[in-house]
Amino acid sequence: MADIIDELIRKRGFASRIFRNREVLHPDYIPDTLPHRENEIRRLAEHLLVSAQGMRPSNVLIYGLTGTGKTVVVKYVVSKLKEKASSLNKRLDYAYVNTRKLDTTYRVIASIAQSIGLRVPHTGLAISEVYRRYINALDSWGGLHIIVLDEVDYYVKREGDDLIYKLVRANEELSKAKIVLIGITNDVNFVENLDPRVRSSMGEIEMVFPPYNAEQLFTILKQRAELAFNQGVIEDGVISYCSALAAREHGDARRALDLLRVSGEIAEREGAERVTIEYVKKATLEIEEGRIYQSVVTLPLHQKLVLKKIVELVEAKESTTTGEVYTAYSNIMRNLKYEPLSLRRISEIISQLDMMGLIISEVVNRGKYGITRIIKIRKDMLPVIKDALKDVEA
């Protein structure tokens, strides 16, 4: 094993020939300037400054597709406001919570409480007790607390909106402090699923982030590339090519940055001197495989079982039907001593897998045999899906 390490060090050394600082290509990086989001920065900062000046806070709901700069703009604005407030001896702080990663109400409220220095155990307290401690500590602190709930639609679908209702009403319980809630979502219909009492308060101010176009993506990538790569390693046309690919996918800056970063990493692995368009093409395939793998491994159990049965049936004869999938799924569930889901629910799961791009399904009319759904899987996706399902016993 040591020989492998020695060989890698001999070939590549400790200093990268490609990257100067690859971190600037990661989605968590917050640059000093955010091209093409000046209007959004100004509008959000104006809303938050009103609250910081002691006026009644207005909660903000931010919509936009993936990679449109929602999260980075919010982080940029709140961190700058915190920095400025600190220099003026004003009390302003924020909690950023990705509610997809912190997947329970307890973990969300604990993270919010911890952001103002409260010590909260990982388990053991009632949610209402953590909330009460947070409100008491916040009022003693006496400043403006900005709570950012990213991917808030996932949280509400999973946990309901009780905590959000408490947070949007929390200012009624506070005499010396204030709370502003910022929700970030990809779902334009998100508020329609909220309790009417929450809906009116959560979306007092709404902002929509439009997708970037290819020209804007080029500016963003050029700015980051100058910081990320050693001089002269990016071949002409690479940044334009990455921008064009990402612009085709609803102007996703995150996708564009991933493409550029992975292209550089592949070039580095292969010992190349420069990042070329060929490496971008390789990166496109690698990222797609990673997306498929993550989509499969994060599926709930029944979806995994259904997909595994589809894989087995498709491998045997290229395509299958809803009825065949349901029979195979029901048999394995009975063997495992579990009650199978209904045929209707399995049909819904198949539709979901189709929408995710993991399978291809088509409803066809077979005359006297009736209407059925033909299900296939792209051949190039089969190995990745099988690998992601390898630990599923079925």
Swiss-Prot record:
GO terms for molecular function: ATP binding; ATP hydrolysis activity. GO terms for biological process: DNA replication. SUPFAM superfamilies: P-loop containing nucleoside triphosphate hydrolases, Winged helix' DNA-binding domain. The keyword Nucleotide-binding applies. It holds the Pfam family AAA_22. SMART domains: AAA (SM00382), Cdc6_C (SM01074). ATP binds at residues 68-72, 212, 224. Keywords: ATP-binding, DNA replication, Nucleotide-binding. Involved in regulation of DNA replication. Belongs to the CDC6/cdc18 family. HAMAP family: ORC1_type_DNA_replic_protein. This is ORC1-type DNA replication protein.
